[in-house]
Amino acid sequence: MRARYRACILSLLVPLALQGQDIGLLRLNPETGGRGKADVYGGYEAGGYHPAFAPASLWKAGASAQGTRHGERTSFTGSFSFEQIDGKEQFTSMFLEPGYFPVDVLEFTPGDKTRQTYKLGGGFATTFAEEFVFGVKADYTAANYAKRKDIRHTTYGMDLQVEPTVAVVGDNGVGLSAAYIFRKRTETIDAEQVGAATDQSYFAFLDKGMRYGTYQVWDGDGIHLDEAGVGVFPVKEFTHGFSYLVEAPMFAGGMSLLWKHGSVGEKGYDWFRYPGFSWKVFLEGRFKGGHSLRLDLNLQNDQLEESVLDKVTAGGITTPTVYAWNAVSDRNWGSLDLTYAVRFLNGPLKLLRAVLHGGLWDEKSYLMYPYEDQTTRYNGMATLVAAFGFGPVDLNLRVNGGAGAWKDQGLSGGSDAVDSVPFRLTPDWLRKMEYFSTTKAGAGLTLTYHLPFVRGLYVQAEGTWLHGFGIDLLPGADRWSSTVKVGYDF
């Protein structure tokens, strides 16, 4: 049991370099037979220090299972998980992951929201010609996100990623792999109003970047939630790219380069489109005495364009026609992480890890010519993790702290010939910036007890706390969570 725990701890030192691309290296020193785990959990989270889209409080429950089996020449891996989250007093973004897409749709009536997420993963790697390995890994996520208070909405999401990989595995523990990456991600917002329409109709906001956009009745033409001929707000995104990974006993390194193209709309009603790219690279050195040092660099970009679209009617048939595309916003962001870790094979202290994180964002809005605006923001965070083992009890302690800053250029480029300025949802933007930039400190504790009478069975309790300093606009200065889990390693 302790050896198994130690193996789990040591795996923390070598996190997956590039999501999914480890499949080709399954054949690098494979264990005999294989291993797996399964767990169920439940938790609660509350507190006022949270982004506007997050709930005031939530309950969650879930289950997961994963396993890996090794044969003489082929290895298989698979996983499944389900999670349900019930949030209270939740509003603003209707998307599953606010901020991921360059557009957003916001509503303003707090209510209960339910999110269900299903994840499936699987893959295989097989050896041929002694040192060569071919593998394929696929990860699929399906989710739905529903609110049952006007304006009601159900958001459906699908995310599929497939990575065929070719690797070379040497007898000296060195592995090289290259993978092609394909990803398709879609989300569809289906909104409706059940209650009777009144003079106080429900409004929504279509964010086209930096909280500049359109604010009107939710089913108006400018929001696109209930456009004739479409009826929903669909987003689809395709990503292609490649990645490389080098794995050795004392060194690891990798790189991925991805290009994406997304669009908003369907059936000829193409309201927006956005190209983008991401570049990730990491380097890790492993030294004597269990020490390791890792550097992660991540750069991303996307550019949002809005169509000049008209509905042309001929012979009683209406056809949407796109005449041109106008740039309305672009985003550039990056992060740099430096991780130092050391493992201990003797004594109660098993792992010590320190992470320094820095992030930089640059956003521009060109929603209404000749105006433009720009925001630059950056943040830094330091995290310290210590893992202990005391017989059947494992203890994980985490502390972190950080701060950020931002600068808004303000609208520029106007002239006397322009009477109006682009609309901005300023209060929500300021709350977003306050959550991002405030000085914060947090802590976490995870306690795991391995039951002695059933090998592999454990019970785990976890608690976290986060505090923001100098809060002015957010509902509170603290956020806390607790989770209880029962699991089995096999």
Language-model segments: residues:
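Short, flexible helix-coil linker/hinge segments at the edges of structured domains or between repeats
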Residues: 92-104, 180-233, 259-268, 311-318
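Outer-membrane beta-barrel channels and translocator barrels
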Residues: 70-72, 127-131, 169-171, 239, ...
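Long, internal scaffold/assembly segments composed of regular secondary structure
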Residues: 215-356
